[in-house]
């Protein structure tokens, strides 16, 4: 995992944590499911994160 990839994942986790602090548990869980699916797809397809499209985050 590259440093850039790790930073992007950490930033997305921070977003989920912010959503949890705000009390919107449904959106936080949904965002974690989106992140999980994208990570699994990258591993399956062998796509580097820099080539992967952005995700539809809900806040």
From Swiss-Prot:
Stored Pfam families: YciZ
TM helices/strands, residue ranges: none
Signal peptide coordinates: none
Alphabetical list of InterPro entries matching this protein: UPF0509
Family statement drawn from the similarity comment of this UniProt entry: Belongs to the UPF0509 family.
HAMAP family according to UniProt: UPF0509
Name under which the protein is recorded: UPF0509 protein YciZ
Source organism: Salmonella typhimurium (strain LT2 / SGSC1412 / ATCC 700720)
Source taxonomy: Bacteria, Pseudomonadati, Pseudomonadota, Gammaproteobacteria, Enterobacterales
């Amino acid at each position: 995992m590259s440093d850039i990839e790790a930073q992007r994942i950490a930033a997305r986790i921070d977003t989920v944590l912010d959503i949890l602090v705000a009390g919107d548990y449904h959106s936080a869980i949904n965002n974690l499911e989106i992140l999980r699916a994208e990570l699994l797809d990258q591993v399956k397809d062998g796509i580097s994160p820099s080539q992967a499209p952005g995700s539809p985050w809900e806040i």
